[in-house]
Regions:
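His/Asp/Glu-rich acidic catalytic environments and adjacent acidic regulatory segments
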Residues: 1, 7-119, 123, 127-130, ...
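A metal-dependent hydrolase signature that marks the N-terminal structural subdomain at the beginning
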Residues: 107-108, 113-187
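C-terminal, non-catalytic "cap/extension" segments appended to globular domains
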Residues: 115, 144-154, 239, 247, ...
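Auxiliary, metal-adjacent structural segments of Zn-dependent hydrolase domains
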Residues: 161-219, 232-233
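Flexible, glycine/threonine-enriched loop-and-boundary segments that flank and lead into catalytic domains
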Residues: 197-225, 344, 348-369
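Short pre-active-site segment immediately N-terminal to the catalytic Zn-binding motif
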Residues: 220, 224-239
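An active-site-proximal "capping" alpha-helix that borders the catalytic cofactor pocket
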Residues: 243, 267-280, 379
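Post-HEXXH active-site segment of zinc metalloproteases
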Residues: 249-273
Length: 451
């Protein structure tokens, strides 16, 4: 009927109108915003883009790091009010949608999509807060190892282990993976071997092939993995990570009807990260000291970037929604203040903060994804906890993991599925376990570095 057609059309318009803040931000950040070239210690210029920024922050050349950092934030800072306004628009949209559907808050609505109790979110933040002294300790160690008196935000990404060569040809990587995943038992390894032997993996870069790596497939197909192999240790991690997704999909599809064979976004990264944790454990036991150091450095960075950083993001995201929900003015100045406060809390007094970092929120696209980022930290914690159980308990933990988690798809709420597999995300325990793994790695790293 004409009426249903016009109602469908108005729905489309409504969706388009409501996604304006995100679209404006995306266009601005990816297309319109330009940065001055970064300059290195020899005065040589380097083109600064969203893609090269982190690469320059990882550089040995402190002048280049500082220049990239200053130029990026000066560009964003020049539009601080505009970007505050687009993010406030996004927050208002989330609150409007929540109230229109009779939810008390934007967070309640966002989490209810996956039936995630709000205590999971609060529990993540509260538990990570308890372990912030560990992050401060890591940051202090970074300062000592870099040998600088004034640790700045642009010194946070540069690797602490230099000049260690670690080539990883694909055939060797397959061996490492199979050995690392041995604790998972025959049923799991058979799936991985089937994937390797039946060409699930498109390994090397090719003309017209998309960059990065990902797993895909449909209910009746095998999972497929696309890689762009370049013989690095991170390629090995990517292989193990993507096989985690593929095995999860394989077990889900084989054991669930098509309507419940796809798993929820809340648990999407758990299987892949659990595999990475098993790989780290195995490699840690089988590498010489130099390579172990390289690995531990990368591991500690992964913890910092995933568990700590994403929790800080989650805390900021919730804070700006609370400000708006309380009827207080949500301005860019207020956002800068709240962000600076959190950055200080997370990094402690070891880092000399500056005005730029208070505007970091304005370069993070995930704040336009409506309570999405916390799942990186919860998923990471769940994976660390599960891998810990697999390595310490053995068979019973493996059976729980495969039968209660990998084979379950979305046949139950994600929180319940994880609970049955041995991880209760409404309690502090999984996050505590993850933080304790971080602590062990930090101790091992410090001991090797000072030895």
């Amino acid at each position: 009927s004409t009426q249903s057609r016009s109602s469908a059309a108005s729905d489309v318009y409504k969706r388009q109108a409501l996604s304006t803040p995100e679209n404006v931000y995306g266009m601005f950040s990816n297309a319109d915003l330009e940065f001055k070239d970064a300059v290195d210690k020899d005065g040589k210029k380097h083109p600064l883009t969203q893609g090269t920024f982190i690469k320059y922050l990882e550089s040995d050349d402190r002048k280049l790091r500082q220049s990239a950092y200053n130029n990026l934030y000066e560009a964003y800072g020049a539009y601080n009010n505009t970007l505050g306004s687009t993010l406030a628009g996004e927050v208002k949209k989330n609150i409007f949608n929540a109230r229109a559907h009779n939810y008390k808050t934007a967070r309640e609505r966002a989490l209810s999509n996956n039936h995630i109790p709000e205590e999971v979110y609060d529990n993540l933040v509260a538990t990570v807060h308890k372990y912030l002294p560990l992050l401060h300790k890591y940051t202090q160690l970074r300062k000592e190892l870099l040998g600088i008196d004034d640790l700045k935000m642009y010194d946070i990404y540069t690797p602490l282990v230099k000049d260690v060569k670690f080539e990883m040809p694909y055939d060797e990587a397959k061996e490492w993976m199979l050995k690392a995943l041995e604790p998972m038992g025959k049923e799991y390894l058979d799936v991985v071997k089937e994937g390797l032997n039946h060409r699930w993996v498109d390994v090397y870069e090719n003309k017209g092939k998309r960059s990065g790596a990902y797993s895909s497939g449909a209910h009746l197909t095998n999972p497929f993995i696309l890689l762009n192999w370049s013989d690095t240790i991170s390629d090995l991690y990517t292989l193990v990570h993507e096989f985690g997704h593929s095995a999860h999909s394989y077990f889900s599809r084989k054991n669930q009807p098509s309507n419940s064979s796809d798993y929820s976004i809340f648990v999407a990264e758990v299987a892949s990260t659990c595999n990475e944790a098993l790989l780290s454990d195995y490699m840690d036991k089988h590498l010489d000291d130099d390579r172990r150091l390289l690995l531990l450095n990368q591991e500690l960075e992964r913890f910092r970037a995933t568990l700590f950083r994403q929790t800080m993001f989650a805390e900021f995201e919730h804070k700006i929604h609370q400000i708006e929900e309380a009827g207080e003015p949500l301005t860019s100045t207020r956002m800068n203040e709240e962000y600076a406060k959190l950055n200080r809390l997370y990094f402690g007094d070891v880092v000399e903060t500056d005005d730029h970092i208070s505007k970091e929120w304005s370069r993070i696209p995930h704040f336009y994804m409506n309570y999405y980022v916390y799942q990186y930290a919860t998923g990471y914690s769940a994976a660390q906890s599960l891998s810990h159980q697999i390595l310490t308990e053995g068979q019973p933990a493996v059976e729980r993991y495969i039968n209660e988690f990998l084979k379950k798809g979305s046949s139950n709420y994600p929180i319940e599925i994880l609970k049955n597999a041995g991880v209760d995300m409404t309690t502090p325990e999984p996050i505590e376990q993850a933080c304790e793994v971080f602590e062990q790695k930090l101790k091992a790293f410090e001991k090797l570095m000072k030895h």
